[in-house]
């Protein structure tokens, strides 16, 4: 068996076996910086984008330090969405295969499932708990789940926890754990409103900020399509009808807009998946199954509903509108061009979007321009073409400039007088040109 660079961390044999099975050879940047700190039981803040290997940066060392001989909860991992919680749980199960690893009991508790069944599962306490904050907090309140001896708490996607209003539940969970708690916080951004919470639980945490090499994947084509005061719904339908995606996601900023788009497209005969925060757990589960079964070519989604969900095979992302928070643009387009594949991110833009587009360009995003004319894709005009266009002076302009000189001593209104004199000369030049042609 080929040795990997993970052997340097003195991890248990079952962890090293898992690393080989998963095909890992060299730790990612965030793993190099955080695995040693987590093994030393230090609290950490990891700021990184999706796809940097952050999940294994905490799973590998935390599973390594669990003692299966102790029948108590030792690690609690919280995630803002059911889908993300389940993904983390599945990764944990992959690591704990084999004779030694299988002694670690892991359980996943998420909202939208039967609470009594969850309570029944807790007659024997697991070593590792993964779940959504609301459900974990409920189980602690019911005295079904005991976390008072758990040494480590993970808060994944902390900025999304804040956005979705889950911080109070996380605070409750943390308050029921030991005072010398090891807290591991992972977030794409660290908003100001999150800082008081971090200060409450963390003293001199190790901080690792992994800057993405590129804001978005190299193989994403960023395409701008002007609305030009056209009916936006019809334009969207036309765009979707002239693409051939494996799977496409249309992003809207609000639940109401997503509902409106879905209703319009359904009326046009399209079979559409819909993902937003207004769905019941049962509806959401059904849509996710339909997506995984490839029943849809397109999904309409809002930002918060789509965060934390791993949807495979997305070839196209369409922004019905630009997000208010431009970080979400990066999250949206990051749905496509994964694992080295290519993808297209199309944005319908208005004239009022100019400021946002300039800011995205300053982040390093280069846009192409396309137009859909009579059912055919054509290269569009650069929205900056008017600003970039240089005025070419004609002969009359040049003569007028030469003949009308700026006075040495200027008086109020001189520009107007100069302009008037130049216009007189230009008219005379045009009359002379006209006579010559006759």
Swiss-Prot record:
GO terms for biological process: response to cold; ribosome biogenesis; RNA catabolic process. A motif (DEAD box) lies at residues 156-159. It is an enzyme of class 3 (hydrolase). InterPro entries: CshB (IPR030881), DEAD/DEAH_box_helicase_dom (IPR011545), DEAD_box_RNA_helicases (IPR050547), Helicase_ATP-bd (IPR014001), Helicase_C-like (IPR001650), P-loop_NTPase (IPR027417), RNA_helicase_DEAD_Q_motif (IPR014014). Residues 392-401 have a biased composition (Basic and acidic residues). Induction: Induced by cold shock. In rich medium highest expression in logarithmic growth, expression decreases and then disappears in stationary phase (at protein level). Protein level not increased at 16 degrees Celsius. Not detected in minimal medium (at protein level). HAMAP family: DEAD_helicase_CshB. DEAD-box RNA helicase that plays a role in 70S ribosome assembly. May work in conjunction with the cold shock proteins to ensure proper initiation of transcription at low and optimal temperatures. This is DEAD-box ATP-dependent RNA helicase CshB. It comes from Bacillus subtilis (strain 168).
């Amino acid at each position: 068996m080929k040795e990997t660079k993970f052997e340097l961390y003195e991890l248990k044999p079952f962890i090293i076996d898992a690393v080989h099975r998963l095909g890992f050879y060299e730790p990612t940047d965030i793993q190099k910086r955080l695995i040693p700190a987590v093994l030393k039981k230090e609290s950490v803040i990891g700021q990184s984008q999706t796809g940097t290997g952050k999940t294994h940066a905490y799973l590998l060392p935390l599973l390594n330090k669990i003692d299966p001989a102790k029948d108590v909860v030792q690690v609690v991992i919280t995630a803002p969405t059911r889908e993300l919680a389940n993904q983390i749980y599945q990764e944990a199960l992959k690591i704990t295969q084999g004779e030694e690893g299988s002694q670690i009991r892991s359980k996943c508790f998420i909202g939208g499932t039967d609470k009594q069944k969850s309570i029944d599962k807790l007659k024997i306490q697991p070593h590792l708990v993964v779940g959504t904050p609301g459900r974990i907090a409920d189980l602690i309140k019911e005295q079904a789940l005991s976390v008072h001896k758990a040494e480590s708490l993970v808060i994944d996607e902390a900025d999304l926890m804040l956005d979705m209003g889950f911080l109070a539940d996380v605070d409750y969970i943390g308050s029921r754990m030991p005072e010398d708690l090891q807290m591991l916080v992972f977030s794409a951004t660290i908003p100001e409103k999150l800082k008081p919470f971090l200060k409450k639980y963390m003293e001199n945490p190790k901080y690792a900020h992994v800057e993405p090499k590129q804001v978005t994947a190299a193989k994403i084509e960023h395409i701008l399509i002007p609305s030009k005061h056209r009916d936006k719904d019809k334009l969207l339908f036309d765009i979707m009808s002239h693409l051939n995606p494996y799977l496409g996601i249309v992003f809207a900023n609000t639940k109401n807009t997503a509902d409106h788009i879905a209703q319009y497209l359904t009326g046009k005969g399209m079979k559409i998946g819909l993902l937003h925060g207004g769905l019941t757990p049962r509806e959401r589960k059904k849509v996710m199954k339909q997506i995984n079964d490839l029943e849809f070519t397109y999904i309409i989604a809002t930002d918060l509903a789509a965060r934390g969900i791993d949807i495979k095979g997305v070839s196209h992302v369409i922004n019905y509108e630009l997000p208010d928070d431009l970080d979400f643009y990066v999250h949206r387009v990051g749905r496509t061009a994964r694992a080295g594949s290519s993808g297209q991110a199309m944005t319908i833009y208005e004239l009022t979007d100019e400021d946002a587009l300039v800011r995205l360009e300053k982040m390093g995003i280069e846009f192409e321009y396309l137009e859909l004319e009579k059912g055919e894709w054509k290269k569009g005009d650069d929205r900056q073409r008017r600003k970039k266009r240089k005025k070419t002076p004609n002969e009359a302009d040049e003569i007028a400039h030469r003949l009308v000189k700026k006075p040495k001593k200027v008086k109020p209104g001189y520009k107007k007088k100069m302009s008037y004199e130049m216009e007189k000369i230009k008219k005379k030049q045009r009359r002379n040109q006209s006579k010559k042609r006759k």
